[in-house]
């Protein structure tokens, strides 16, 4: 019989329960199921009980076997955070572009001059799979220290069949050997590479007719994404790629209406996309159609913050009944952060979402955006024991005390992987510092 873990008497247990079948929308987004002085009991990899501490003690009295107690007094307990939009696997860095943008260059002008995504593509193509895996593990380590237990990871920095497959194989490897679960998305249509600049339709055909079948044949991704944007992929090109993806079992996602109102939100509704992401310039009609179709809006306030632009109109989407999720958009050009808690801060401060809304958007709704809501995203009996203890007296403090990492303990599938804010090495359960590129070391993980 598995040892029971008793997370005892947290100041608050934020369950976000009751929305595993469909995401929270409208006023329900603020209903996050807070249990004051609550406790959670974990058995093996699953949550066995969540409720008041008095009820937890009664539950334990009826059980036999060993019980390990983790004192949670003075802390709050939430579901493991879920990041539904990252560009995790890449090589290189683009810090020089920050100075370019500060001097007036736009994101698209940098891209069209061969920088931006194309700069990262050059580095990623040149990197070996081992190099990509090493750099990406370090990013996952930092995600974990910020309370993120599941991430989505897109390809899109290969922009050639072999390089795209390389990225996706690395993501699959990381899912197998790192505590953070990695859910893969194929995004060969992230930009037009230089060799196809004079024949963009030819590249679209390559993505749809060569890349997608190979991705599906190797079962390397669950979703297909496309950058539907002026100067990148047209609505017609985007629809063709997404429909071809659907034929091969890849569920559609869209980078939509980030820079201009371009019809991406409307296309997301038309093709039945799981999510439309960015949406800074989404039209009122597009928002209405997304609500009717149940398309999740994955909002990325960190990208708007870093690019110094106005964020998406989260309030209009929530009031229209669009399910809203939050994400870091971790990437080297427009959102170089692994701190989903900081993104939650930005959602409050720049998009006027409430502390309750951002918690739901970063847990259960984010889980819906990657098809994992039946297993993660809330604290309910039978779900995976992905949990975070924050060193905070209440959940409001997480958004009030902004840009501070208050993660104390992270549990993944019933195993403690972060304690006292520090990663634990699974092989001997000894504390180790966060690996960095300079130290060249990392925790050894095996699922």
From Swiss-Prot:
<dbReference type="InterPro" id="IPR032466">
    <property type="entry name" value="Metal_Hydrolase"/>
</dbReference>
<feature type="binding site">
    <location>
        <position position="87"/>
    </location>
    <ligand>
        <name>Fe(3+)</name>
    </ligand>
</feature>
<dbReference type="GO" id="GO:0005737">
    <property type="term" value="C:cytoplasm"/>
</dbReference>
<keyword id="KW-0479">Metal-binding</keyword>
<feature type="binding site">
    <location>
        <position position="85"/>
    </location>
    <ligand>
        <name>Zn(2+)</name>
    </ligand>
</feature>
<keyword id="KW-0378">Hydrolase</keyword>
<keyword id="KW-0408">Iron</keyword>
<feature type="binding site">
    <location>
        <position position="333"/>
    </location>
    <ligand>
        <name>N-formimidoyl-L-glutamate</name>
    </ligand>
</feature>
<keyword id="KW-0369">Histidine metabolism</keyword>
<feature type="binding site">
    <location>
        <position position="329"/>
    </location>
    <ligand>
        <name>Zn(2+)</name>
    </ligand>
</feature>
<dbReference type="GO" id="GO:0050480">
    <property type="term" value="F:imidazolonepropionase activity"/>
</dbReference>
<feature type="binding site">
    <location>
        <position position="331"/>
    </location>
    <ligand>
        <name>N-formimidoyl-L-glutamate</name>
    </ligand>
</feature>
<dbReference type="InterPro" id="IPR011059">
    <property type="entry name" value="Metal-dep_hydrolase_composite"/>
</dbReference>
<comment type="similarity">
    <text>Belongs to the metallo-dependent hydrolases superfamily. HutI family.</text>
</comment>
<keyword id="KW-0862">Zinc</keyword>
<keyword id="KW-0963">Cytoplasm</keyword>
<feature type="binding site">
    <location>
        <position position="94"/>
    </location>
    <ligand>
        <name>4-imidazolone-5-propanoate</name>
    </ligand>
</feature>
<dbReference type="GO" id="GO:0008270">
    <property type="term" value="F:zinc ion binding"/>
</dbReference>
<dbReference type="GO" id="GO:0019556">
    <property type="term" value="P:L-histidine catabolic process to glutamate and formamide"/>
</dbReference>
<dbReference type="InterPro" id="IPR006680">
    <property type="entry name" value="Amidohydro-rel"/>
</dbReference>
<feature type="binding site">
    <location>
        <position position="157"/>
    </location>
    <ligand>
        <name>4-imidazolone-5-propanoate</name>
    </ligand>
</feature>
<protein>
    <recommendedName>
        <fullName>Imidazolonepropionase</fullName>
        <ecNumber>3.5.2.7</ecNumber>
    </recommendedName>
</protein>
<dbReference type="Pfam" id="PF01979">
    <property type="entry name" value="Amidohydro_1"/>
</dbReference>
<feature type="binding site">
    <location>
        <position position="334"/>
    </location>
    <ligand>
        <name>4-imidazolone-5-propanoate</name>
    </ligand>
</feature>
<dbReference type="GO" id="GO:0019557">
    <property type="term" value="P:L-histidine catabolic process to glutamate and formate"/>
</dbReference>
<feature type="binding site">
    <location>
        <position position="157"/>
    </location>
    <ligand>
        <name>N-formimidoyl-L-glutamate</name>
    </ligand>
</feature>
<feature type="binding site">
    <location>
        <position position="329"/>
    </location>
    <ligand>
        <name>Fe(3+)</name>
    </ligand>
</feature>
<feature type="binding site">
    <location>
        <position position="85"/>
    </location>
    <ligand>
        <name>Fe(3+)</name>
    </ligand>
</feature>
<feature type="binding site">
    <location>
        <position position="255"/>
    </location>
    <ligand>
        <name>Fe(3+)</name>
    </ligand>
</feature>
<dbReference type="InterPro" id="IPR005920">
    <property type="entry name" value="HutI"/>
</dbReference>
<dbReference type="GO" id="GO:0005506">
    <property type="term" value="F:iron ion binding"/>
</dbReference>
<feature type="binding site">
    <location>
        <position position="255"/>
    </location>
    <ligand>
        <name>Zn(2+)</name>
    </ligand>
</feature>
<comment type="pathway">
    <text>Amino-acid degradation; L-histidine degradation into L-glutamate; N-formimidoyl-L-glutamate from L-histidine: step 3/3.</text>
</comment>
<feature type="binding site">
    <location>
        <position position="190"/>
    </location>
    <ligand>
        <name>4-imidazolone-5-propanoate</name>
    </ligand>
</feature>
<feature type="binding site">
    <location>
        <position position="258"/>
    </location>
    <ligand>
        <name>4-imidazolone-5-propanoate</name>
    </ligand>
</feature>
<comment type="function">
    <text>Catalyzes the hydrolytic cleavage of the carbon-nitrogen bond in imidazolone-5-propanoate to yield N-formimidoyl-L-glutamate. It is the third step in the universal histidine degradation pathway.</text>
</comment>
<feature type="binding site">
    <location>
        <position position="87"/>
    </location>
    <ligand>
        <name>Zn(2+)</name>
    </ligand>
</feature>
